[in-house]
Swiss-Prot record:
This protein's GO CC annotations: mitochondrion; small ribosomal subunit
Function: Located at the top of the head of the small subunit, it contacts several helices of the 18S rRNA.
Species the sequence originates in: Glycine max (Soybean)
Pfam families membership: Ribosomal_S13
Name of the protein in question: Small ribosomal subunit protein uS13m
Predominant location: mitochondrion
A Gene Ontology BP annotation from the UniProt entry: translation
The keyword Aminoacyl-tRNA synthetase belongs to this UniProt entry's keyword annotation: no
Biased composition (Basic residues): 129-142
Keyword annotations from UniProtKB, A to Z: Mitochondrion, Ribonucleoprotein, Ribosomal protein, RNA-binding, rRNA-binding, Transit peptide
Transit pept. (range): 1-27
Subunit and partners: Part of the small ribosomal subunit.
Length: 148
C-alpha cells in the first residue's frame, strides 16, 4: 500500500516538473535548498525569479546584479550558477515562510485587538482608505453556509 503511494507521488512529481499543455512544454527547475520553489526554465532569469512568492521586479534585478550573472535563460545556467542562486535566495524570506510570517503578524494584530487587527477581522481596509464609495472588494459580504 505504501509503495504504491510512493510511486504515485513520484509520478505526479514528474508530471508537475515536465508538463505539456496544448503542445507547449513547460519544465521547471527546483530551487530547493531550504528555499522551496520552482522556476520555469524557458524564461530569462529575471522573469523566472518573479515566479517565487515574495520576489518582484526590483528584487529579481537586484539578485541578478549581485550575482553578476547574465540575464540568460534558466535552462542555460550552469550548476555553479544555480548553486549560487540557491545560496543567495536562502537569505531572503520568500515562499511559504513569507506567507506564514505575514499570517503570524496579522494574527498578532488581531490578538492584541488594536485598530488594524479589528479592521482585519471585519474585512475592512486598515490603512485609512475611504469605505463609503470604494473598497468594494474588501467590504464584500462573506457567504455563510445555511444562509440565503
Amino acid at each position: 500500500m505504501f509503495g504504491s503511494a510512493r510511486i504515485l507521488s513520484d509520478v505526479t512529481l514528474r508530471l508537475r516538473q515536465n508538463l505539456s499543455v496544448h503542445g507547449v512544454r513547460v519544465q521547471n527547475i527546483n530551487i530547493g535548498g531550504g528555499v522551496g520553489g520552482e522556476i520555469p526554465d524557458n524564461k530569462r532569469l529575471v522573469y523566472a525569479l518573479q515566479n517565487l512568492h515574495g520576489i518582484g521586479r526590483s528584487k529579481a534585478q537586484h539578485i541578478v546584479a549581485e550575482l553578476g550573472v547574465e540575464n540568460k535563460f534558466v535552462k542555460d545556467l550552469s550548476k555553479r550558477e544555480l548553486y549560487s542562486i540557491r545560496e543567495l535566495l536562502s537569505k531572503y524570506l520568500i515562499g511559504n515562510d513569507l506567507k506564514k510570517c505575514v499570517e503570524r503578524d496579522v494574527g498578532r494584530l488581531v490578538g492584541i485587538q488594536c485598530y488594524r487587527g479589528i479592521r482585519h477581522v471585519d474585512s475592512l481596509p486598515c490603512r485609512g482608505q475611504r469605505t463609503h464609495t470604494n473598497a468594494r472588494t474588501r467590504r464584500s459580504r462573506k457567504t455563510f453556509s445555511g444562509s440565503r
